[in-house]
């Protein structure tokens, strides 16, 4: 999240006349992230305060956005804790603000944990599997817009900025992924709506209280979602939640907790087990490419904080050089 398109207090107040959410009490930009303009909104209605997030979409179009917004609505209706889009007085959940497509959604309770525990990794794995199953009957279809076709388009633009071993890795991994995506095994992998960006800062936990265990507040920021292989979504999540940040090496306990919890809800197929390493590489490559793109070909933004691209270069090198990796799953009982 970030602020590319500013919105004044007067502009948001006028825009909110189209909604029945009450009077504005606080409105501020959210500095984290790199894709859309986001704001926290507090309103008061009938003596009660309500918390929302307002998003202006900088790249996604009116034609693309219904997939994301109605997916969130669909998941919320299937007991997956996600932000719910708020309809206006006319029933619409998407409209224009300062020349950009915009929406307002509920703000989830809780906080992100950037140093997740083994238990939290298990909680996320369980809910990710439930989210995948809940999305099976979602009727809309839109591919992951940051998958291979986008890599093919963007990599030639960033190659001139990198050199030596880094350029070789960028080009060689693209060739590897092109072969993998063209394979019959890849085509057979199960798929459906995926979050595609389930990093630690896109998940909230509500703190434990009165002896109760910590609970999941929810998943948010679905604006990179798309129909993709479920295993890709798992790999993206593991590559962020279950690694040593300094080296990119997978942490055995956290990885096992996430995979076992996921597998208990939606068992992995044999093909998924065989191609775990390929998908870990694909997930690392996707974010390395996007961070190179944002770093070397940046857009203007009031509060933009581009991510360091070398982090996912390090993760990718670790996945490529780790030897054969398969899913570490529970063994069947005899």
Curated annotation (Swiss-Prot):
GO MF entry, a single one: homoserine kinase activity
Keyword entries, A-Z: Amino-acid biosynthesis, ATP-binding, Kinase, Nucleotide-binding, Threonine biosynthesis, Transferase
Keyword Methyltransferase: no
UniProt-listed Enzyme Commission number(s): 2.7.1.39
InterPro entries tied to this protein: Aminoglycoside_PTrfase, Homoserine_kinase_II, Kinase-like_dom_sf, Pseudomonas-type_ThrB
A Pfam match: APH
Coiled-coil blocks: none
SUPFAM superfamilies per record: Protein kinase-like (PK-like)
Entry keyword Transcription: no
Reactions catalysed, as given in the entry: L-homoserine + ATP = O-phospho-L-homoserine + ADP + H(+)
Leading EC class: transferase
Biological or metabolic pathway of the protein: Amino-acid biosynthesis; L-threonine biosynthesis; L-threonine from L-aspartate: step 4/5
Single GO BP term: threonine biosynthetic process
Family (UniProt): Belongs to the pseudomonas-type ThrB family.
Protein name in the entry: Homoserine kinase
Species this protein is from: Ralstonia pickettii (strain 12J)
Taxonomic classification: Bacteria, Pseudomonadati, Pseudomonadota, Betaproteobacteria, Burkholderiales
Gene from which the chain derives: thrB
């Amino acid at each position: 999240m970030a602020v590319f398109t500013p919105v004044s207090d007067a502009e948001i107040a006028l825009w909110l006349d189209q909604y029945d959410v009450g009077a504005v009490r606080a409105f501020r930009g959210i500095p984290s992230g790199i894709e859309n303009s986001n704001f926290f909104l507090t309103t008061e209605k009938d003596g009660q305060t309500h918390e929302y997030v307002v998003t202006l979409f900088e790249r996604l179009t009116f034609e693309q956005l219904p997939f994301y917004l109605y997916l969130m609505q669909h998941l919320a209706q299937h007991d997956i804790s996600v932000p719910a889009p708020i309809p206006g007085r006319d029933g619409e959940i998407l409209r224009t603000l300062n020349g950009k497509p915009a929406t307002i959604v509920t703000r989830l309770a809780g906080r992100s944990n950037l140093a997740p525990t083994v238990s939290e990794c298990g909680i996320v794995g369980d809910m990710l599997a439930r989210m995948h199953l809940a999305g099976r009957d979602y009727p809309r279809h839109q591919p992951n817009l940051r998958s291979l076709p986008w890599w093919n388009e963007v990599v030639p633009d960033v190659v001139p900025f990198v050199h030596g071993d880094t350029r070789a890795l960028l080009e060689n991994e693209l060739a590897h992924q092109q072969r993998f995506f063209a394979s019959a095994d890849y085509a057979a992998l199960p798929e459906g709506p995926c979050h595609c960006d389930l990093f630690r800062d896109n998940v909230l936990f509500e703190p434990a209280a009165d002896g109760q265990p910590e609970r999941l507040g929810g998943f948010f920021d679905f604006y990179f979602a798309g129909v993709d292989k479920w295993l890709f979504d798992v790999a993206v999540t593991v590559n962020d939640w279950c690694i040593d940040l300094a080296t990119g090496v997978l942490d055995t306990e956290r990885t096992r907790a996430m995979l076992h919890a996921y597998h208990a809800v939606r068992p992995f197929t044999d093909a998924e087990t065989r191609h775990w390493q390929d998908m870990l590489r694909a997930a690392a490559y996707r974010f390395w490419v996007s961070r190179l793109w944002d770093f070397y070909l940046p857009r203007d933004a009031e509060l933009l904080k581009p991510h360091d691209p070398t982090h996912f270069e390090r993760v990718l090198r670790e996945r490529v050089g780790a030897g054969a990796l398969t899913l570490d799953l529970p063994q069947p009982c005899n």
